[in-house]
């Protein structure tokens, strides 16, 4: 049985002011993008200043998550140490060994195809279990060619609902916005939700 109120991760934060607003609004995780060639990517020095400012404020701060995709492990671990990241979200094809060697708690993204077969759904459940058994939190996101996370597109929620109904805890991502997030939570029953492009105005 999933919790009534899912955890909320706000991703793609680029300024201290936005991070503070998200934290004050009750976000459980703050996400910063470090994936090359992504519109919301932050340089390490700016990210470090943002994290320092957020964590030095009154009342503490939610965990800060750095987003990466198929980048060298040394680069990821350097960013963790430089920016004082609490967690990382790995949006590519990173292996279990890669996750284990990361110097922070890991959120591992699994991309869901538009029309998976029953066999592939079974494989997804096995992969979720494998990553969770290794200490990772799992995120389910839509599969869009050429994009790794932050697609702005949803997938068939019945697939996620079926996985959740079988006891798989995960964060739901992909095209979530203020207009559809309540329906998504009611339909799927996820452990958490990840909103990014759906709450943006510009940039």
Identify the function of each model-found stretch.
Residues 11-14, 39, 68, 91-94, ...:
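Structured beta->alpha junctions
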Residues 1-11:
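N-terminal amphipathic alpha-helix/helix-capping segment at the start of soluble metabolic enzymes
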Residues 26-27, 84-85, 135, 189-190:
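A structural motif
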């Amino acid at each position: 049985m999933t919790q009534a109120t899912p955890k909320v991760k706000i991703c793609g934060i680029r300024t201290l002011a936005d991070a503070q607003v998200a934290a004050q609004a009750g976000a459980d995780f703050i996400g910063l993008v470090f994936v090359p060639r992504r519109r919301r990517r932050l340089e390490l020095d700016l990210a470090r200043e943002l994290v320092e400012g957020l964590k030095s404020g009154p009342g503490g701060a939610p965990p800060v998550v750095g987003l990466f995709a198929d980048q060298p492990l040394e680069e990821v671990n350097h960013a963790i140490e430089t920016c004082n990241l609490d967690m990382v979200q790995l949006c590519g094809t990173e292996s279990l060994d890669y996750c284990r060697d990361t110097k922070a708690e890991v959120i591992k993204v699994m991309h869901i195809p538009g029309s998976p077969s029953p066999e592939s759904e079974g494989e997804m459940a096995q992969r979720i279990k494998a990553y969770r058994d290794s200490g990772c939190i799992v995120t389910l996101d839509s599969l869009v060619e050429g994009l790794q996370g932050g697609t702005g597109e949803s997938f068939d929620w019945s697939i996620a609902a079926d996985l959740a109904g079988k006891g798989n805890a995960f964060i739901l991502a992909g095209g979530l916005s203020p207009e559809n997030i309540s329906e998504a939570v009611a339909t799927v029953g996820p452990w958490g939700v990840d909103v990014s492009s759906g709450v943006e105005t510009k940039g």
